Amino acid sequence: MEQQQQQQQLRNLRDFLLVYNRMTELCFQRCVPSLHHRALDAEEEACLHSCAGKLIHSNHRLMAAYVQLMPALVQRRIADYEAASAVPGVAAEQPGVSPSGS
């Protein structure tokens, strides 16, 4: 059980780092047009702050929607699984009826 928790934590960390790296790359490409200076100028810094803030806000909204929809998705998957499991059982319970219908 502990190993599963560690694997889940590693997956969560990997997912976080992928999102972070993608956000960093996207904002850097948008906001830093040249690398002629060692330091960011005020305009670049403001752009990066705005870009990162927008992406973080969007990510929070997506996660909130995901958390809200997740119980319904799980219930639907359970119902689909139960329905799919019940279909082969019905044909097996009826003697003389083949599953292919012939």
UniProtKB/Swiss-Prot annotation:
The record's disulfide annotation reads C27-C51, C31-C47
Does Mitochondrion appear among the keywords?
yes
Motif: Twin CX3C motif; annotated at 27-51
Domain description from the entry? The twin CX3C motif contains 4 conserved Cys residues that form 2 disulfide bonds in the mitochondrial intermembrane space. However, during the transit of TIMM10B from cytoplasm into mitochondrion, the Cys residues probably coordinate zinc, thereby preventing folding and allowing its transfer across mitochondrial outer membrane.
Instruction: List where in the cell it is found.
Output: Mitochondrion inner membrane
SUPFAM superfamilies tied to this protein: Tim10-like
InterPro entries, per the entry: Mito_inner_translocase_sub, Tim10-like, Tim10-like_dom_sf
Role this protein plays: Component of the TIM22 complex, a complex that mediates the import and insertion of multi-pass transmembrane proteins into the mitochondrial inner membrane. The TIM22 complex forms a twin-pore translocase that uses the membrane potential as the external driving force. In the TIM22 complex, it may act as a docking point for the soluble 70 kDa complex that guides the target proteins in transit through the aqueous mitochondrial intermembrane space.
Alphabetical UniProt keywords = Disulfide bond, Membrane, Metal-binding, Mitochondrion, Mitochondrion inner membrane, Protein transport, Translocation, Transport, Zinc
- Report the principal subcellular site: mitochondrion
Q: Which organism is it from?
A: Pongo abelii
Pfam families registered for this protein in UniProt: zf-Tim10_DDP
Record's protein name: Mitochondrial import inner membrane translocase subunit Tim10 B
How does this protein sit in the membrane?
A: Peripheral membrane protein
Could you describe the subunit structure of this protein?
A: Component of the TIM22 complex, which core is composed of TIMM22, associated with TIMM10 (TIMM10A and/or TIMM10B), TIMM9, AGK and TIMM29.
* Any one cellular-component term (Gene Ontology): TIM22 mitochondrial import inner membrane insertion complex
Q: Which GO terms describe its biological process?
A: protein transport
